[in-house]
């Protein structure tokens, strides 16, 4: 995981610094809604925080392990949340566009439609299409 200072900008794109934004969720606070969890997960990918990614993944769909780009070849370039909707009292969907580059290659755009579920007051990533 990358070191940071409290004033570093948050990778998720919100105006708050990392410590006041996604950093608090990476430290164990519960995300208040699915969009915030999705933003915190994006920031975890940027910072290569595998522990948070696995902890925020619903146990029914969580992989046993997650291998990220340990060589640091992937550079995350930005996040654009296109839609976040509650689909039930404890379910939600978030559609977002993330941009990244691998090595010196061209930037890639990835659109994802993610599903989330809340259990015992905590939101979890369920799956995506």
Curated annotation (Swiss-Prot):
HAMAP family for this protein: UPF0225 (MF_00612)
Family recorded in the similarity comment: Belongs to the UPF0225 family.
Protein name: UPF0225 protein XCC4159
Organism: Xanthomonas campestris pv. campestris (strain ATCC 33913 / DSM 3586 / NCPPB 528 / LMG 568 / P 25)
